[in-house]
């Protein structure tokens, strides 16, 4: 899947949609098929709201499928396309909603299912520049539509 062509079809969206449990604001989201080899249950369980970055497979049989971004994998860092904001019915829906442009409080973003909930994940803060995340007033601002 060609990311540039995908984003050219999106166009501009002029409103921000509120994600209540996260106190976040997302401007545009699209459904993407989930990588079937990922244990999605560990990413969506637990009582606390959370968000995490996802990358997209560019080639091979899983092209177009998304997976949670591994912060130690350079290929995954280069192919980040957005963030999953809060829960998803992963057992009944093979497509996850990926937010491409948003403002999310940093305490909700954990890039490791074992990371403590509701605390800023230091690995994400350290990689913010590489991930194209701007940290402003306690929020990550990102725009992967560009």
Swiss-Prot record:
Primary location class: virion
Record localization: Virion
Keywords: Capsid decoration protein, Capsid protein, Virion
Domain of life of the native organism: Viruses
Any one Gene Ontology cellular component term annotated for this protein: viral capsid, decoration
Function, as annotated: Cooperatively binds the expanded capsid, thereby stabilizing the mature capsid shell and allowing the large viral DNA to be packaged. Trimers of capsid decoration proteins molecules are located at local and icosahedral threefold axes and stabilize the expanded capsid, which shows increased spacing between capsomers.
Subunit structure: Homotrimer. Interacts with the major capsid protein.
Name listed for the protein in its UniProt record: Decoration protein
Organism per entry: Thermus virus P23-45
Organism phylogeny: Viruses, Duplodnaviria, Heunggongvirae, Uroviricota, Caudoviricetes
């Amino acid at each position: 899947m060609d990311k540039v062509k995908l984003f050219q079809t999106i166009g501009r969206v002029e409103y921000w949609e509120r994600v209540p449990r996260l106190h976040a604001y997302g401007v545009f989201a699209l459904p993407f098929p989930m990588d079937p080899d990922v244990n999605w249950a560990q990413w969506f369980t637990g009582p606390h709201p959370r968000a995490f970055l996802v990358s997209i497979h560019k080639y091979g049989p899983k092209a177009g499928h998304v997976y949670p971004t591994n912060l130690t994998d350079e290929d995954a860092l280069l192919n980040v396309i957005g963030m999953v904001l809060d829960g998803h019915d992963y057992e009944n829906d093979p497509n996850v909603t990926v937010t491409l442009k948003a403002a999310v409080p940093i305490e909700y973003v954990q890039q490791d299912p074992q990371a403590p909930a509701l605390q800023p994940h230091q690995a994400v803060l350290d990689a913010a520049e590489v991930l194209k995340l701007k940290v402003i007033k306690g929020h990550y601002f990102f725009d992967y539509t560009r």
